[in-house]
C-alpha cells in the first residue's frame, strides 16, 4: 500500500509540466500544447536561464529525488522499485494528466532518474552522449537513442534490474516520439520521429 501511495505521488509530481507553468503563470504567454513542452523548448524559444532552471527541476526534483528517496530514506524493499519509479515518471512527464495526455519528451527526467538508479552507468550515458553529439551527429535526437542503447548493453554486466530500467526508458522514449503530441500515420514521419525526434530530417 505504501508503494502504491508513493508511486501515485511520483506520478502527480511528474505530470506537472514546469515549462507550461513558466509560460502561463510567470510569462503569461499562450503556447501550443502540441509542441514538446520541455526545458529545451524554453531554452530555444524563450530564456536560457529559465531553460536551465526547468531542466534542473525536471532532472533533479522530478527525476533524481524520488529514486534517492526510495533508496536512502524510505528504504523501500522491492526488487523492481526503480523500474516502477522510472516508468511512472516518464509516463507522467510524457503524457501529463494536466495537459490532456500531452507533455515533454522525458529526456531530462530520465537523466536524473537514471543517475539515481546507477551512478556509474549514468556517467557512461552522459559521456557517450557528449562524445557522439560533438564528434559525430550534432543532433540530440539520434544521439540520445544511441547513447541509451549503448548504456543498456553495458548495463547487462551490472544488473538485470538496471537493464530493465534502460530498456523501459528506450521503449517509452520511442513511444513518445512515435505518438508525439499529435500522432501522424505516415511512415516517413514515424521513422524521422524515432531517429531524429522530429517530423522531417
Locate each region found by the language model.
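N-terminal signal-anchor transmembrane alpha helix
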Residues: 1-27
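Helix-coil boundary and interhelical linker segments in multi-pass alpha-helical membrane proteins
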Residues: 1-7, 63-84, 115-121, 154-165
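C-terminal ends of transmembrane helices
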Residues: 20-24, 91-101, 130-136, 177-181
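Cytosolic, membrane-interface loops and tails of multi-pass inner-membrane proteins
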Residues: 22-52, 182-201
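Short, non-helical or kinked segments that cap or interrupt transmembrane helices
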Residues: 28-38, 97-109, 138-146
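Multi-pass membrane catalytic core of lipid/isoprenoid biosynthesis enzymes
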Residues: 45-71
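Loop-to-transmembrane alpha-helix initiation sites
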Residues: 122-124, 139-147, 156-171
Amino acid at each position: 500500500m505504501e508503494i502504491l501511495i508513493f508511486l501515485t505521488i511520483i506520478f502527480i509530481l511528474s505530470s506537472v509540466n514546469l515549462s507550461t507553468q513558466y509560460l502561463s503563470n510567470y510569462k503569461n504567454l499562450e503556447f501550443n500544447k502540441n509542441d514538446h513542452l520541455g526545458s529545451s523548448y524554453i531554452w530555444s524559444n524563450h530564456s536560457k536561464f529559465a531553460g536551465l532552471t526547468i531542466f534542473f527541476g525536471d532532472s533533479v526534483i522530478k527525476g533524481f529525488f524520488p529514486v534517492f528517496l526510495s533508496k536512502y530514506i524510505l528504504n523501500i524493499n522491492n526488487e523492481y522499485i526503480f523500474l516502477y519509479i522510472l516508468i511512472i515518471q516518464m509516463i507522467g512527464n510524457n503524457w501529463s494528466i494536466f495537459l490532456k495526455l500531452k507533455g515533454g519528451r522525458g529526456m531530462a527526467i530520465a537523466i536524473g532518474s537514471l543517475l539515481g538508479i546507477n551512478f556509474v552507468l549514468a556517467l557512461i550515458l552522459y559521456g557517450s552522449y557528449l562524445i557522439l553529439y560533438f564528434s559525430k551527429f550534432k543532433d540530440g535526437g539520434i544521439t540520445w537513442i544511441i547513447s541509451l542503447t549503448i548504456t543498456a548493453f553495458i548495463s547487462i554486466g551490472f544488473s538485470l534490474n538496471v537493464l530493465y530500467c534502460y530498456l523501459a526508458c528506450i521503449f517509452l522514449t520511442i513511444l513518445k516520439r512515435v505518438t508525439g503530441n499529435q500522432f501522424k500515420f505516415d511512415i516517413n514521419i514515424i521513422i524521422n520521429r524515432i531517429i531524429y525526434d522530429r517530423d522531417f530530417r
